[in-house]
């Protein structure tokens, strides 16, 4: 009893000390935070007052300027908040180019109305609507990038990419689907265009589209250009599908019959996979250009695709560009129709959450390559070589040691595709390609456990193929993915997925390659696909030997964490000046790597970083190494079955 009484006294004394300390802290000198301003009105699922008229003049192609006028219905005397789209679908991030909005001026009944930017949310503009005003005239410019360092170039003297999210201000407080827009665009004389929007009328260079919800408008960009062609990819099909091409020159639009057939086969193979479609019509927008910025961005009834100018005219040299269209087309099912519940938002200024991108992007990456092979856009060997490159890359990325695959779904928000000094350690949007390997693992496991009677094709049809013809988004949770997998083959799919999403094991998840009947190997000769990738990126990729990727003038644009070059202190931006005492060139460096395999001498490099020169000795003796997949005859050739066209 005495001991207890003593302990109680101590506890009471400690409590008194804590309370007195709390009082002292509460009374301490120093600044206190100001209260935050009232939050922007949350979106409600009710219709906006009336349609907003949106007029875009896209004729100033020399200066890359889009000129915008909106007429927005308002309630007289009531405050209004206008939002510039911030969280952009498909970007999975707050990437709206608010810095490119300029010249914002608002008028009511001909009189200037001042606006004030929100002190916390820079994408929001407060407007005091005058008494007696029933609408506001809102004028501004989208001063799009002139050069790549400013952002993606979307307008050139020969083509443009109009993304409506860049040229729209809209009222806060409403779901995007409840705001109606009446859009009009003025294009340069003689240009042609394509979009998923439906045309109401055309008067010379001025086109008026049928009214659309803000949701649909933002989901329906325009590609327009001086050199344009349109190809029917599904003549007589259930819903029109077209390939709409703009190019830097007219000769780049030449498409051979077999190339057209491969793109038509893409549509048919997608229908065989999913057993449905989720659009009234679909436009694959394709820009073949060195001047407008590249892109791959999904929409429900269209996709934006920008790739090398010689996509068709030098077909055999561009294998690594031919999975782009299948990837973006697949998103009509996976990403636009079936959408993660935490990624869907009611308007474009509510934050997205990206936790299920390993389905949205990872499985799309998987089906993109599979459909490319089944359609004949890629040969089986090219597809295997592409998979070898992916498997090797992730087998050498040691960042998994500290950062799980699940966390890379946050990368679009955290990094927003900014350059990384140590990508193999920091990790990037690995939910795409490591996600692809995870879904290959799942596909081959389903095949193995079902005696090769079921496959991930069955999951795709059951999960993405529902509600044929509907393009109202159908959201899902992690549990829904697990349930759908169990409907194909009963298994502990939750543990399977969480182990791969949350694990920190060394090396890439290569069980799918092994179960698919192949093994990852390295030889001294690169595949044609690997060489095509090097050529398009304008680099020499020595990742699997010296641990570097070398760009023009011997400058390193990637260094593998814990690789030979890393261990000698080389970094991105380092320039190789000399190899073994002779002036640098790529062939000389490759010869030195080969020679070092035959002797004990180190490879000596004179390097420059900034204004500092030094000599490093790379003690590397394993020769040139390039990834390939080699057939393992002890396992069924499931990968070959996966890549075979469906009848």
Features from the language model and the residues they span:
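Non-catalytic architectural context of zinc metalloproteases
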Residues: 46-49, 59, 65, 69-71, ...
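C-terminal recognition in membrane/secretory proteostasis and scaffolding
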Residues: 368-369, 378-647
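N-terminal secretory signal peptides that target proteins for export/translocation
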Residues: 1-7
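Juxtacatalytic substrate-recognition/specificity segment
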Residues: 70, 232-357, 363, 367
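Bacterial N-terminal signal peptides
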Residues: 9-22
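N-terminal-proximal low-complexity accessory segments that begin disordered
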Residues: 51-57, 75, 85-87
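N-terminal, polar/Ser/Thr-rich
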Residues: 27-61
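Ligand-binding face of N-terminal immunoglobulin V-set domains in extracellular IgSF glycoproteins
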Residues: 67-69, 79-84
